[in-house]
UniProtKB/Swiss-Prot annotation:
HAMAP family: EF_Ts
Record PROSITE patterns: EF_TS_1
Main localisation: cytoplasm
Disulfide bonds: none
Similarity comment text for this entry: Belongs to the EF-Ts family.
Keywords for the protein's UniProt record, in alphabetical order: Cytoplasm, Elongation factor, Protein biosynthesis
Sample GO molecular function, one term: translation elongation factor activity
SUPFAM superfamilies (alphabetical): Elongation factor Ts (EF-Ts), dimerisation domain, UBA-like
Name of this chain's protein: Elongation factor Ts
GO cellular component, one term: cytoplasm
Record region (Involved in Mg(2+) ion dislocation from EF-Tu): 79-82
One matching Pfam family: EF_TS
Gene name, Swiss-Prot/TrEMBL: tsf
Subcellular location: Cytoplasm
Length: 291
């Protein structure tokens, strides 16, 4: 299949490899970006792409807390200009507060909630859309419950483009907020390595076994090296094993232990996570308009 310049650029942005290497990998992978990344990693030319690296949509995230319940939401807009204005921020807070109040099951149920007599949450979103002139959508949310002995910690980064919500047991709200800051900044995927699904580990092992630097090595040596790399991989994606963002001399596990607590769960939202933004070629668009 024909490989486009846009595909090559996207792969280079994600892996930092050269243009020809990116194109060769895409050709070999039949244009499949994820497969191309794996092929480059097998050749030792690229690191693992982070799960949340496809960020494209605009908008903001927010966290609302009410007693033993908290909600984290993502509200999308078409441009960052609208995402930063007063009307959008007012809507963002209203949506978060409504969701934490009623704990709806899903987005559809949330949009049907009555925020005031005769007006649903969806009506309110449509009203703000009419004011701003841009389509605004509630993309997703999570509602988290805690016990009386537990504490919430939340942190918003880069003017709400990233938010994190953490539940700790035994530790203070301040400690929970510090861990939420770490989650927002470092983007772990799991609390601990025992939560990593077997298929994720199996895929990583497959990639490592195919690494060119293992060619010709005895099987027992190869197995030991792969085992070490898997251990490192698990530490990189597991919150408790990561160096703590506020003190790199200790892990998150050591920090929370020093606070006489434990991490129960976390949720991290980054605006546009997993959404591919449509890129328009200006010259092509003008040509179309001119017929």
């Amino acid at each position: 299949m024909a490989i486009t310049a846009a595909q090559v650029k996207e792969l280079r942005d994600k892996t930092s490899v050269g243009m020809m290497d990116a194109k060769k990998a895409l050709v070999e992978a039949d244009g499949d970006l994820d497969k191309a990344i794996d092929l480059l990693r097998e050749k030792g030319m690229a690191k693992a792409a982070k799960k949340g690296d496809r960020v494209a949509a605009e908008g903001m995230t927010a966290v609302a807390v009410k007693g033993n319940r908290a909600a984290i939401i993502e509200l999308n807009s078409e441009t960052d200009f609208v995402a930063g204005n007063a009307e959008f921020n007012e809507l963002l807070n209203a949506v978060a507060n409504t969701i934490v109040e009623f704990a709806p099951a899903d987005v559809e149920a949330a949009l049907a909630l009555e925020v005031q007599e005769g007006q649903t949450l969806n009506d309110k979103i449509i009203g703000t859309t009419q004011i701003t002139g841009e389509k605004i959508t509630l993309r997703r949310f999570s509602v988290v419950e805690k016990s009386d002995s537990e504490n919430f910690g939340s942190y918003s980064h880069l003017a709400g483009s990233i938010s994190a919500l953490v539940v700790v047991d035994g530790a203070s709200e301040e400690a929970a907020k510090d861990i939420a800051m770490h989650v927002a900044a470092i983007a772990p995927q799991f609390v601990s390595d025992d939560q990593v699904p077997a298929d994720v580990i199996a895929k990583e092992k497959e990639v490592q076994l195919a690494s060119e630097d293992l060619n010709g090595k005895p099987d027992n040596i190869k197995e030991r090296m792969v085992e070490g790399r898997i251990k490192k991989f698990l530490a990189e994606i597991s919150l408790l094993d990561q160096p703590f963002v506020k003190n790199g001399d200790q892990t998150v596990a050591q920090f929370i232990s020093s606070q006489n607590g434990s991490v129960k769960s976390f949720v991290r939202y980054q605006v546009g996570d997993g959404i591919e933004k449509q890129v328009t070629d200006l010259a092509e668009e003008v040509a179309k308009q001119l017929g």
